[in-house]
Amino acid sequence: MKTYTAKPETVQRDWFVVDAAGQTLGRLATEIARRLRGKHKPEYTPHVDTGDYIVVINAEQVRVTGAKTTDKMYYHHSGFPGGIKSINFEKLIAKAPERVIETAVKGMLPKNPLGRDMYRKLKVYKGANHPHTAQQPQELKI
């Protein structure tokens, strides 16, 4: 029996909608990253993007445990000397709640062109509305 290798043109991709309300950030992000990679499918192939599209709603209602609301820091750099910027979880969730989930999931995906393609299939929105109703996403319980 030959080992099956998925072909990019034959991969069946589904759309799923995930409600982040009351979910723990890390546990939610690991399951989303797993589904974006396609590891939940029997035809998973490491060098082919076999993952599904994931739409996350209610991003502002995601939660973290312990004192991470004030202690968890997000860093970025302007590119200039001394240009390191930081913001904590509490301020970032108020300013741009989508970035919290996007950052957590992006860190769990491969750091290569294939990982960037997987990341593009993630759509995160604050609030319960999203513009992907035409794709008829199925609800995914995590």
From Swiss-Prot:
CDD domains, per the entry: Ribosomal_L13
Keywords (A to Z) from UniProt: Ribonucleoprotein, Ribosomal protein
Gene Ontology terms: cellular component: cytosolic large ribosomal subunit
Keyword Cell membrane part of the UniProt annotation: no
Protein name listed in UniProt: Large ribosomal subunit protein uL13
A matching Pfam family: Ribosomal_L13
NCBIfam families noted in UniProt: rplM_bact
Chain's role: This protein is one of the early assembly proteins of the 50S ribosomal subunit, although it is not seen to bind rRNA by itself. It is important during the early stages of 50S assembly.
PANTHER family for the chain: LARGE RIBOSOMAL SUBUNIT PROTEIN UL13M, RIBOSOMAL PROTEIN L13
Gene source species: Pseudomonas paraeruginosa (strain DSM 24068 / PA7) (Pseudomonas aeruginosa (strain PA7))
Gene that encodes it: rplM
